[in-house]
UniProtKB/Swiss-Prot annotation:
One MF term in the entry's GO annotations: 2-C-methyl-D-erythritol 4-phosphate cytidylyltransferase activity
Sites marked Transition state stabilizer: R20, K27
Function as written in the Swiss-Prot or TrEMBL entry: Catalyzes the formation of 4-diphosphocytidyl-2-C-methyl-D-erythritol from CTP and 2-C-methyl-D-erythritol 4-phosphate (MEP).
Keyword vocabulary terms for this entry: Isoprene biosynthesis, Nucleotidyltransferase, Transferase
Signal peptide: none
UniProt organism field: Pseudomonas fluorescens (strain ATCC BAA-477 / NRRL B-23932 / Pf-5)
Matching CDD domains: CDP-ME_synthetase
EC number(s) given by UniProt: 2.7.7.60
PROSITE patterns: ISPD
Catalytic activity: 2-C-methyl-D-erythritol 4-phosphate + CTP + H(+) = 4-CDP-2-C-methyl-D-erythritol + diphosphate
Sites annotated Positions MEP for the nucleophilic attack: R161, K217
Gene: ispD
Superkingdom as given in the UniProt entry: Bacteria
GO BP term, pick one: isopentenyl diphosphate biosynthetic process, methylerythritol 4-phosphate pathway
Protein's UniProt name: 2-C-methyl-D-erythritol 4-phosphate cytidylyltransferase
Length: 235
């Protein structure tokens, strides 16, 4: 891994509502350690010297963003989010193109509700992929025994976990290649769950970079409680 890391753009799709949290606001605006989850997710990028700029995709009627201190940071640009994650990311990429970003610029897409990204993992991703022809993503090898089930919840088989990884973020790809993959997949009405799946559909093979397992995405209330306890123990 090189000591000289590449410059990059960051994209944070933050237009979702996080219904599984059953909270009074989108999960990215819930509190964690005195700040919102979204502020923590943005912070690792804003503190990085390689950041060229950051685009956050937000719901049109988002009432929470303007109250955040980072909403006035000149390095952050806001765009309208889409109905799905892929649309939100595509809107951000179109905005970067309009601002003069080049097709071969690196773009890192990170979940708005993944607040515990470490600087070491970010630097590892940048260093390992800076010369990669495709790009890739942080990921973690599956640890638990995995079962494939039928529609009734009955086990069909045990899956070989040595071949299974959990996809995390950031996911790092060239701006032009990711833009084409997302745009074409939307036209083809292909189900895209993350940026890597769009690149896979386009015929590419993203590289997995092993990261920390505590870079978890807040999806359920117990995820947030786990992070709160962990952060409290750091004090």
């Amino acid at each position: 891994m090189s000591d000289v890391l590449p410059a990059f753009w960051a994209v944070i799709p933050a237009a979702g509502v996080g219904a599984r949290m059953a909270a009074d606001r989108p999960k990215q605006y819930l509190q964690l350690g005195g700040r919102t989850i979204l502020e923590h997710s943005l912070g690792c990028f804003l503190d990085h010297p390689g950041l060229k700029g950051l685009v956050v995709s937000l719901a049109v009627d988002d009432p929470y963003w303007p109250a955040l201190a980072c909403a006035h940071d000149s390095r952050i640009q806001r765009v309208e989010g889409g109905a799905e994650r892929s649309g939100s990311v595509l809107n951000a990429l179109l905005h970067l193109h309009a601002q003069g970003a080049a097709d071969d610029d690196w773009v890192l897409v990170h979940d708005a509700a993944r607040p515990n990204l470490s600087r070491d993992d970010l630097d590892k991703l940048l260093g390992e992929l800076m010369d990669d022809p495709v790009g890739g993503l942080l990921a973690v090898p599956a640890r638990d025994t995995l079962k494939r089930v039928d529609k009734h919840g009955r086990v069909l088989e045990t899956v070989d976990r040595s071949l299974i990884w959990q996809a995390y973020t950031p996911q790092m790809f060239r701006l032009g290649a990711l833009h084409r993959a997302l745009a074409d997949s939307l036209v083809a009405d292909v189900a895209i769950t993350d940026e890597a799946s769009a690149m896979e559909w386009a015929g590419q093979a993203p590289r997995l970079i092993e990261g920390r397992s505590d870079n978890l995405k807040v999806t359920r209330p117990e995820d947030l409680e786990w992070l709160r306890q962990r952060w409290s123990n750091r004090r």
